[in-house]
């Protein structure tokens, strides 16, 4: 089972990783380590993969799987409620697992320097635009300069194609977002966007400057990652 471990400078007791599509039991086109039950994969295969996740990485308990809707809602763990529609998870308690699922969307992991607060956010372009990262950071008691972030694999700046309306939505929040887009040389009227750059801009505006990751492209590395 292949994973990617963040290249960030955090306390050793903070365990973080992102899985790839290798090492599970799902059949094509979901081969093989698909953890999402919202796609048309066999439910028993997804259940097996989730069990493998817990066993392989010695997780302290079965993690909470969110119903992700490109929202800005953050759930704080431990959570006893039934409403799982959210796109980020935060905790300041030990032995909690913050988990989000992504394909082309951007996964962002957070911790403070002391390793007493952690979070994970699912940032598709809609959630990123609407403020899911900002809402996640609001949960932290630590000051922004004490927070460290890592960008997991997402669709890269040479593959994320959008229309002018998407750029305008980002610019409505902050005009600097325009610098994260460039005309697509292969299609008139379309643009290529850099989710990593936009997320960096958003976090920098909050005062978070210790940011790692952002070197993968799920669209071009389809052997390793799921992509639409």
Enumerate the predicted regions with their spans.
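Active-site microenvironment for binding and transforming phosphate-containing groups
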Residues: 1-228
